[in-house]
Amino acid sequence: MTEAVPISTGGTPVEVKGLTYSYIEGGKPVLTVDSFRIEDGEVALIIGKSGGGKSTLVNCFNGVIPHIFMGSNPTGVVVYGNVVKDTPLPKLSAVVGTLLQDPETQVLNYTVEEEVAFGPENLCLPTEEIRKRVDEAIATTDITSLRDRETYVLSGGELQRVALAAVLAMKPKMLIMDEPTSNIDPEGTARVFETLTGLKGKSTLVIVEHKLERALHFVDRVVLVDQGKVLFDIEKGKLVDHLEELHASGIDVPEHYLWAKRFGLDPQNIDAIRARIVADGLKLEVPPRQNDGKVVMDAFAHVEAQGKTLVDAEISLKEQQILAIMGRNGAGKSTFLKTVMNFLDKELTARSKLVINGVDLSKASIQQRGKYIAYVPQSFDLMLISKTVEEEISYSLRKRGAKDYKEKTEEFLNLFGLKDFRRRDPLMLSVGQRRRVAMASALSSGVKIVMLDEPTSGQDFYHKEIISKELHMLKRLGYSFIIVTHDAKFVYRYSDYLVILDSGKKILEGTPEQVFESSQLYSVVPPTEFYLRNPGIPLPELSRAGV
């Protein structure tokens, strides 16, 4: 029997030399990195297109590659003096903690407290130490109010904070976070980054993130990864000199960086940028809105869990309208969509009414409702049932007897940037790519009312634009959309109507500019101000509703 290899906790957190990896032995490399290094206590931000290799790279640091995803055997990756390919995953997890994009794949236990305690318990720590770590992690992530809650009733954003607490309770030397705020509202995003700011200098942090405006204020380095290669690795202060490269790689450059370059100002000096915008009288153009069509769907939902009201709201959708629903995590946004589709857990009590084009579907089954509404939930992986991307997208087309299903499949593959992945297993793609597969599959059903839960989550700027153009093209063809999102910029640019939910109730509705500028949203917030929020710091007038 081979003697167990002791885990080293000293040395450089990450050192890469001559890394090449492909998911299939002998296949085309998806990652080629000549040299890369992360120093102790650094905060490294890894950015790039969806599917560009960011998650693959960090999975080489935490041992997921090659111990879970086999493929070719990557050499040249050393973490704290441990050769990753030769170090068992349980030993690596003692020094490297990982927060995944999708918290539902990471949260395993029935209650929040049990989940946070699970890791320390597996380290066989004394009971008092476990309690201490649980208390600290729950306090650090500000989830005290969730401590005794069942994990299955939590929103995606709440689950993400629970998953972060569970990782922090392990007290890893290095923390890897793969899109840690993808499902979190702006208020929760700010809380996460406040938590991470408190860890700076105490732990080494590696963050994969699309929300640059939130992360840039506290990172040390920015690493751009595209097509499996490190294109640049620079200090944060030099980022303003690489804006063209960021655009070319599908990165949504923070608004204040664009203004800073235009005015010749320091991008970190938000006050100076705002003052210049006000002095020059610059304003955002208001996009055209489509809100005068006939009502195609009336939906009411009242949902309770253990006597607590989760949702009590009615929303009407008009023909050729893109209606967005925003609000803080736990506001009832996703629960509303699930109620419309009759997808609720048995533990929840619900009353609902659904009328589509004059047809009362209040007592209709999921299957019957599916003939009128296409739905892509947050947990979209449950939709992916086929062996290849091509089969997944063509399934609905073939099922409804479309004679031109091959041509339509090709069209959707092209529209959603999936042509190069047509033969791939959907579940082996990145989160952003899988989400696009699910959306393409839903839209191929031909149903004219579509509900999308967080469609831009995990997407880079390039693919957000693709999704937006596809939605507007379909809107012109008579489609109507309800979109749950935390992406305020997406809402302002592309939606026609906005509903704000808070504690399950509608507190505000109107066009995006009406809502964002309304004093009812706890102060007047001009669109320019809204675009230029101080990175990482929620404005008090926006914090309550989580817009």
Where are these predicted regions, by residue range?
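Conserved beta-strand-loop-alpha-helix hinge in the C-terminal portion
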Residues: 229-256, 505-528
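Catalytic Walker B motif of ABC-type/P-loop ATPase nucleotide-binding domains
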Residues: 175-178, 450-453
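Conserved ABC ATPase signature
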Residues: 150-154, 158, 425-429
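H-loop/switch region of ABC-family ATPase nucleotide-binding domains
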Residues: 209-210, 485-486
